[in-house]
Amino acid sequence: METEAADESGFTSVASKRGRRKRRAAGAEPMEAAESAEAAGPQPSKRPAFPPLPAAALGVGKGEVRKVPVPANRYTPLKENWMKIFTPIVEHLQLQIRFNLKTRNVEIKTCSETKDLSALTKAADFVKAFILGFQVEDALALIRLDDLFLESFEVTDVKPLKGDHLSRAIGRIAGKGGKTKFTIENVTRTRIVLADSKIHILGSFQNIKMARTAICNLILGSPPSKVYGNIRAVASRAAERF
């Protein structure tokens, strides 16, 4: 059922006659073309060319929803700052937002006017940052800039501390009157929230890395003066590099 033809390099190419016989019988393929194609061997298939999809076909405006749970201690701040949160999400990102009183979730939904695919993710990150304890003005940077991220970890992830030892570690991160935390924020250009034993950092990837290293050193017992010197040296090297 199959024919074998030897080419110049000595390799044997195998071609099937079944499909060609049917096409010959139907008159769709002339005898000469079939014989030449048979002698040449199997032809490589061409890559398909697909046109780019329009935004309407990518699912924009089809009612995608993101839900951000709100803990009880953030109800009052959310109510007081609702218009500051509502305005940029609705006017700039063209999304719909509401607070569901039954499920205690902030629900963000796309609509027919939504043009940007990443708007829903930006809005959800913005609301999440506020719920974690960041100021609205700081959290707004997540909407304006694309290279900002949120990172969260616990003190016990760095060192398994309990009782007074855990309290002292948290106090070392904050410093007297918040001095240590503010110094780390200013040098690394980040924003830090201390919520009990949880630590939330907002900033660019490289700056988050510097702030996280400084906080971990404080938890592990390094004196604050040494930590200040280390992060200032790292920050100056990074500034020279860029």
From Swiss-Prot:
- Which parts of this chain are annotated as the region Disordered? 1-53
GO MF annotation terms: RNA binding
* SUPFAM superfamilies found in the cross-reference section: Eukaryotic type KH-domain (KH-domain type I) (SSF54791)
Which InterPro entries has this protein been placed in? KH-I_PNO1_first (IPR055212), KH_dom (IPR004087), KH_dom_type_1_sf (IPR036612), KH_PNO1_2nd (IPR055211)
Biased composition (Low complexity) is annotated at: 27-40
Family matches, as SMART domains: KH (SM00322)
Q: Where in the cell is it found?
A: Nucleus, Nucleolus
Q: Which CDD domains match?
A: KH-I_PNO1_rpt1, KH-I_PNO1_rpt2
Q: This protein's superkingdom? A: Eukaryota
KW tRNA processing (keyword) present: no
Q: What is its main location?
A: nucleus
Pfam families under this entry?
KH_PNO1_2nd (PF22891)
Keywords annotated in UniProt: Nucleus, RNA-binding
Share an example GO biological-process annotation for this protein: ribosomal small subunit biogenesis
Record-annotated KH domain positions: 158-215
Name the GO cellular-component terms.
nucleolus; nucleoplasm; nucleus; small-subunit processome
Q: What does this protein do?
A: Positively regulates dimethylation of two adjacent adenosines in the loop of a conserved hairpin near the 3'-end of 18S rRNA.
The text of the family note is: Belongs to the PNO1 family.
> What protein is this chain from?
RNA-binding protein PNO1
Gene name of the record: PNO1
